[in-house]
């Protein structure tokens, strides 16, 4: 089966393959995000201390056979039951180009 990779991050993702070629995966028009709220817990003087609550993902397409999605680590962690979500591995820089050496399933 052929697999299509779609980039749901708001930026290009550069991946260096096993042959040393760097592939640029362009982003889709609307990135996937985790919807969050911040609630004040207390103040230290005038500095607020907040608690973040996660309310679900937005703009994440349903599971589709033959398609995998590059997303942020936060999106992948929130929807950890999905096996079609990929995150970039550790990033490197070479000749001014930032890239990863692969994609990771959480």
Role assignments for model-derived ranges:
Residues 2-4, 8-106:
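Intrinsically disordered, low-complexity segments enriched in small/polar residues
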